[in-house]
C-alpha cells in the first residue's frame, strides 16, 4: 500500500472508530491523552530508523544501499533484523500474541510508520503469513491497536517518542549493547541537546557524554580493521573494553599519567587506541592468560603506567601486526551477500587472528611478566624460580637444530651478565 493510500485509510478510521481507552504520551513538551484505534496491518510499514536494529540497518545500508520499507523484499529484511535482535524473547512474544492477541498499544504516524511497536507488528505479520497458524490466531493479528500521531509530527517528534517509549523505558526486551550508543549519536546529529538526550533516554548527563564518546570509539575501531559502517563486526564483550579504553584516554588527555610529556600525549593516545582495538579484535580469553585491563587499568600496575614497559609492548605489538595483509572489505562485499557476506567477513577476521595471535600473545605476556616481576622485586627467590622454570622449558633439541643462533647467543650473554650480578650481590651480602 502506497503512502497516500495508507494516509487515506488511517484517516478514515481515526474519524470514526475508537478502541477502548486512550494512551497518555509526552508529546511536544506536554503530557496528553491520545485515542487508540484499530488499524489494518496492511496500512502499516516499518520504521527503518528503529533504534532496536540501528546497527543492523546501518551495516546493511553501508553494504547494499538504503532500505525502503514499502518494498516487500526490504520489509522482509527488516523483519528478519527485528527477529534476530533477540530471538528467544521474540519466540516467546510471538506465542503470547498468537494466544492472546496484541496486549499493548503502539504508536504510528499519520502515514502508518511504526514509531513504537515494530517488533510486535513484525510478529503479528509473521502469524498472518504462517500457513500453519490457526485461523483464530490470525484473526487476532489482523488489526494493530495504536495511537495515531497528528499529521504535523516532525522527524524530531518521532525520534523523541521512540526514544522515550523504547530506549527510555523498554526493559521487556533489552536492546543490544551497541544500539544505545548509535541512538545517542543519531539524536545528537538530529539536533537534540545533551539535556534532551538525557531526558528521553533516561540517562544522566555524564552517561550521555560517555555514550557519545564510546560511539566515536566504535567508529574508530571499525576504521582500524577497515570495516567502516559495518557495525555487526564488533565482537561480543566489546562494550566493557571500550569503556575501559575511554577512561584511559581521559586520563591521558588530563595529563594524569606522569611519565607522558605533553609532546607525546597524542602519540600515546593513538598507540593506545590501535593496540586496544587489535586486542579486542583478537578476542583473547582469560584462559589464554589475558586480561584487557592489564593493558590500561589494573590498579596494581598496568602496561600504560610504566614508560619502558609501554614502549616495549607497543614495539612488540607493532612487529606482530605489521605487514599483515588482508582482503579489502569492498572486494568481499562485491562477491558476497547476506549470510555469505557474514561468513566471509568472519573468515577474514579468523585469518587475521591466525596470523597475529602468537606474536600478540607473546607481546602481552612479555609486558605482563615485567609488571608481575616488578611487583615481586622484593622476592628474589620467587623471581629466580621463574628463571629456573623458564630455562627448564627450553627444548635443547630445537636449539641444536637451529641454523641461526645469533639472537640466542646474545640472550645467553645477557643471562650470564645478570647471573654474575646476582652472584656478586650474594657474595657481597656474605662479606
Q: Would you name each region that the model predicts?
A:
Residues 226-263:
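Intrinsically disordered, low-complexity basic tails/linkers immediately adjacent to helix-turn-helix/homeobox/MYB/SANT
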Residues 81-82, 129, 138-223:
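Amphipathic, charge-rich alpha-helical segments that serve as recognition/docking helices
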Residues 119-135, 265-297:
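Short active-site loop/helix that positions an aromatic residue
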Residues 331-410:
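Charged/polar low-complexity intrinsically disordered segments, enriched in acidic residues
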Residues 283-320:
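Eukaryote-biased activation of long, low-complexity terminal tails and linkers
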Residues 1-24, 31, 35, 391, ...:
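An acidic, glycine-rich, mixed-charge low-complexity segment common to nucleic-acid enzymes
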Residues 11-18, 250-284:
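Bergerat-fold GHKL/Histidine-kinase-like ATPase
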Residues 1-136:
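Short, charged/polar connector segments at secondary-structure boundaries
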Amino acid at each position: 500500500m502506497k503512502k497516500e493510500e495508507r494516509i487515506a485509510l488511517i484517516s478514515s478510521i481515526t474519524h470514526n472508530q475508537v478502541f477502548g481507552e486512550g494512551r497518555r504520551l509526552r508529546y511536544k513538551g506536554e503530557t496528553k491523552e491520545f485515542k487508540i484505534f484499530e488499524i489494518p496491518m496492511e496500512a502499516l510499514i516499518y520504521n527503518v530508523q528503529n533504534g532496536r536494529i540501528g546497527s543492523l540497518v546501518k551495516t546493511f545500508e553501508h553494504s547494499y544501499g538504503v532500505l525502503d520499507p514499502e518494498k516487500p523484499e526490504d520489509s522482509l529484511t527488516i523483519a528478519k533484523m527485528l527477529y534476530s535482535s533477540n530471538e528467544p524473547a521474540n519466540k516467546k512474544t510471538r506465542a503470547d500474541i498468537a494466544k492472546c492477541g496484541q496486549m499493548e498499544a503502539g504508536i504510528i504516524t499519520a502515514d502508518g510508520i511504526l514509531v513504537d511497536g515494530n517488533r510486535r507488528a513484525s510478529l503479528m505479520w509473521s502469524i498472518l503469513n504462517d500457513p500453519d497458524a490457526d485461523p483464530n490466531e490470525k484473526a487476532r493479528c489482523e488489526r494493530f491497536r495504536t495511537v495515531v500521531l497528528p499529521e504535523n509530527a516532525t522527524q524530531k517528534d518521532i525520534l523523541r517518542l521512540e526514544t522515550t517509549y523504547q530506549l527510555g523505558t523498554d526493559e521487556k526486551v533489552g536492546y543490544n549493547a551497541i544500539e544505545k550508543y548509535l541512538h545517542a549519536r543519531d539524536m545528537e546529529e538530529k539536533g537534540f541537546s545533551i539535556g534532551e538526550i538525557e531526558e528521553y533516554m533516561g540517562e544522566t548527563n555524564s552517561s550521555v557524554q560517555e555514550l557519545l564518546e564510546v560511539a566515536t570509539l566504535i567508529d574508530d575501531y571499525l576504521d582500524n580493521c577497515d570495516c567502516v559502517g559495518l557495525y555487526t563486526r564488533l565482537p561480543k564483550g566489546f562494550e566493557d573494553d571500550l569503556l575501559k579504553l575511554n577512561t584511559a584516554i581521559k586520563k591521558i588527555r588530563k595529563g594524569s599519567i606522569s611519565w607522558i610529556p605533553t609532546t607525546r600525549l597524542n602519540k600515546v593516545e593513538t598507540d593506545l587506541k590501535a593496540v586496544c582495538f587489535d586486542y579486542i579484535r583478537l578476542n583473547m580469553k582469560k584462559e589464554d592468560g589475558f586480561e584487557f585491563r592489564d593493558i590500561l587499568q589494573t590498579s596494581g600496575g598496568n602496561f600504560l603506567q610504566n614508560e619502558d614497559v609501554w614502549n616495549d609492548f607497543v614495539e612488540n605489538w607493532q612487529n606482530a601486526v605489521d605487514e599483515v595483509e588482508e582482503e579489502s572489505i569492498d572486494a568481499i562485499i562485491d562477491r558476497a551477500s547476506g549470510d555469505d557476506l557474514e561468513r566471509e567477513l568472519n573468515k577474514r577476521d579468523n585469518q587475521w587472528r591466525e596470523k597475529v595471535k602468537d606474536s600478540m600473545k607473546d607481546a602481552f605476556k612479555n609486558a605482563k611478566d615485567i609488571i608481575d616481576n616488578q611487583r615481586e622485586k622484593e622476592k628474589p627467590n620467587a623471581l629466580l624460580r621463574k628463571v629456573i622454570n623458564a630455562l627448564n622449558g627450553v627444548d635443547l633439541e630445537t636449539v641444536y637444530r637451529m641454523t641461526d643462533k645469533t639472537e640466542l647467543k646474545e640472550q645467553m650473554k645477557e643471562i650470564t651478565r645478570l647471573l654474575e650480578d646476582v652472584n656478586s650481590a650474594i657474595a657481597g651480602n656474605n662479606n
